Amino acid sequence: MKNNNKFWILFGLTILLSLSSQLFGQVNRVLNISPTAHETSVGNQSLFFRSPAHNFFTKDDSLSQVTFTRMNWLGNITEGMTFNYVEGNWKDFDISLTYMDYGQQKHTDDMGVILRNFSPNSFIVYLGWGTQLNYKDIPMKNTFIGFSGKFIKHDLFTEKGSGLLLDAALHQKNILDLFDLDVMLNNWGYAPKIGSVSTEIPTNIGIGTTIEKNNLTFYNQWNFYKGYYTHGQGVKYRYNNFLNLKMGYFNDVEYKLNYPTLGIDLKYANYVLHVGYIGGSDNLPLRNTLLTSINVEF
């Protein structure tokens, strides 16, 4: 009997450690979350809104801005998970801070007595820079490049880890007088190590196109990971420079995340309110997620 009990105890520990390793290994997926409502509502168009090369192209030297986002995450399956994001644009630089709180957890002893509460979390610091590309000291009117770095730290209570990731981006404007092109290598570098577990980095090559026709803007973006890809598409209707109506669709076959998105932007003076909504089927963990971002220009 003792040998039999010992077998099941060892078996259970093996399964538990395996699950922990898988969870730790996937913790960097926080990097794939679209942090603002205006990005999410057109099918997660991260290149158009956050590529350092594209941000430099759209930069107004007289304008700086700050964006704030806070939302409940995976509210259909858990409580207490929050996503918090703040971004600032100044001259040629973009700076952002991301804080993901995975919700309050309980640490118990072997008898089930609660010893303390804790909140595992992830923290990301981002710095991006862009510039116009020169050829033989002559500026190339339609070509821009950008680079960015991310410091990421995970605090999972019993284990901690940090890493450094880099991005490189290209923005090519007005190809064939039809569309703009964004290309970006995302998330390559030193992966955080959680205890003895090596984490997986969501390294990918992103390709995005943008077409503007009168008051309509059409977006497409493909993200190519090792062995699979995701695709987002969206459209924005602009009305009198104070109202945007948006819709999109995101498709991730590998992780079975397929959902429509909706959004609206309202601008008053130097303030812009972005509201986004994620729809989807009843079994989608992200279903009915509401995102609100506030943009302040100065």
Where are these regions (language model features)?
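Bacterial N-terminal signal peptides
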Residues: 10-20
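Subset of outer-membrane beta-barrel
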Residues: 24-298
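Bacterial N-terminal signal peptides that target proteins for export
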Residues: 2-11
